[in-house]
């Protein structure tokens, strides 16, 4: 806050009110009074005292001029990574800022940042389910995972590797060296339960400290059996840390009786809510699924806006992205459902 003095502030012998000094963060001024040899008549001194008290009261009651106070406020830029495809799944490129419309909690927002095929650094965690139902396919997961890592990582990107069964175990911390991920993939080991939601929760927190895009790629047949973390808790952590989830659902080859349909649905909705995507994998199809994840990450639009006209008291702000001119073209637009804010973000 900046306090400026105008007009009366320059008067010699001005009286500083307690209120003005407190607002500006300044100590009261004390002026040295010179003793005059010839004392004023008692009536003159009384008149001066009354005038001084009146002036002090006037200054104390006088509101500070608006132009004399400056407030500075930080406003958060909300970043949305958006994928657009047609009804056949083909990627739609060549769109411009003017093609998109963004709203938050039903209130229109102005797009301040726009980029095609964002070159922001990519921070990705590969999380592999090694519970008993999928551990038998670990050789396929290891080989396909290595090819995915070597094809995806660029000089500015980083990747980490975790496995989850009865518990979550980090095999490789964030690195830009594919060989380190390879060595981690060679150390996969099995377990009994499936701590799926624990893996999402912990991976989201780890990714939350990174700049750029944050992506969690899950390879699982679906279904959390550890029951330490709930679906809602896992999803909230992903949204709080702006993590996009890509679910690669490795369903059993056997009949549908061996499938966890509820768990598969959870993987699908986690991807939808965070702006990612889900893929079903048939026998030997992991390479194709990884390739589609890589393509999806390389064909994103980045939209950014500074929130305005927010509804007070909201913790979660829901966003909506549309392409008005595409109303009749059945475009599929994917982006995260919204974002959490510990306190309302003020607009300008």
Q: Where do the model's predicted regions map?
A:
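Low-complexity, intrinsically disordered or signal/transmembrane-proximal segments
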Residues: 10, 22, 31-33
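Ser/Thr/Pro/Gly-rich low-complexity, intrinsically disordered segments
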Residues: 1, 7-10, 19
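Bacterial N-terminal signal peptides
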Residues: 47-60
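Scaffold/interface architecture of coatomer-like assemblies
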Residues: 64-348
